Amino acid sequence: MVTRDRAENRDGPKMLKPLVEKRRRDRINRSLEELRLLLLERTRDQNLRNPKLEKAEILEFAVGYLRERSRVEPPGVPRSPVQDAEALASCYLSGFRECLLRLAAFAHDASPAARAQLFSALHGYLRPKPPRPKPVDPRPPAPRPSLDPAAPALGPALHQRPPVHQGHPSPRCAWSPSLCSPRAGDSGAPAPLTGLLPPPPPPHRQDGAPKAPLPPPPAFWRPWP
């Protein structure tokens, strides 16, 4: 009984070893593939475009790139904001590639039902979202002045004069029609109101002008010579 248990315990690690080895090789291959893509982005070397490049060659490219960067940028030198932004973008791209590689490995080993469910969820997440509607103000809008051209305008009406009634004559013209009506033969200008105006004052004598002689007094009849 004890011998059988020991035999089963010995066979357990032997059965798990191929699976662990396979996972370890998959991790190495994914890391090397990511390293190849990063080196291709940085160096633009056409040899790195080959997806079946030898692992040793990928490692040699990585060592040469790091050695060259250490010569250009010695350690301890502060980096500029542009370099920090490039480093952040590179980290983001590398993380995105790592996620894609893990997703591809999971989809390859998953069942068809799980793969279909995963792709459906990804498709719904990556689908463009419709724009959100703007919030509606519950308060009613304020009334605006009418812009209808047929509506009466208020501006010109303020400058119009009140109409003059022509039915009854004015009291001034009631007793003297000749003062209000123009004379015959005139050029259309109204006659001056001579009956209502006071007589013009005598002309003032200018200083220094000679005085006019006074007329002689009238003769009176006397009984004596």
Curated annotation (Swiss-Prot):
Disordered: annotated segments: 125-225
Cellular component GO terms, alphabetical: chromatin; nucleus
GO molecular-function terms, A-Z: DNA binding; DNA-binding transcription factor activity, RNA polymerase II-specific; protein dimerization activity; RNA polymerase II cis-regulatory region sequence-specific DNA binding; sequence-specific double-stranded DNA binding
Swiss-Prot/TrEMBL GO biological process terms: mesoderm development; negative regulation of transcription by RNA polymerase II; Notch signaling pathway; post-anal tail morphogenesis; regulation of neurogenesis; rhythmic process; skeletal system development; somitogenesis
Residue stretches making up the Orange domain: 92-122
Keyword DNA-binding: yes
Keywords, comma-separated and alphabetical: Developmental protein, Disease variant, DNA-binding, Dwarfism, Nucleus, Repressor, Transcription, Transcription regulation
Low complexity bias (residue ranges): 147-158
Pro residues: bias regions: 212-225
Pfam families per UniProt: HLH (PF00010)
Positions of the bHLH domain: 12-69
Subcellular location: Nucleus
Residue span of motif WRPW motif: 221-224
Its biological purpose: Transcriptional repressor. Represses transcription from both N box- and E box-containing promoters. May with HES1, cooperatively regulate somite formation in the presomitic mesoderm (PSM). May function as a segmentation clock, which is essential for coordinated somite segmentation.
Domain comment, as recorded: Has a particular type of basic domain which includes a helix-interrupting proline. The C-terminal WRPW motif is a transcriptional repression motif which is necessary for interaction with Groucho/TLE family members, transcriptional corepressors recruited to specific target DNA by Hairy-related proteins.
Disease: Spondylocostal dysostosis 4, autosomal recessive: A rare condition of variable severity characterized by vertebral and costal anomalies. The main feature include dwarfism, vertebral fusion, hemivertebrae, posterior rib fusion, reduced rib number, and other rib malformations.
Subunit structure: Transcription repression requires formation of a complex with a corepressor protein of the Groucho/TLE family.
Protein name (Swiss-Prot/TrEMBL): Transcription factor HES-7
Organism listed in the record: Homo sapiens
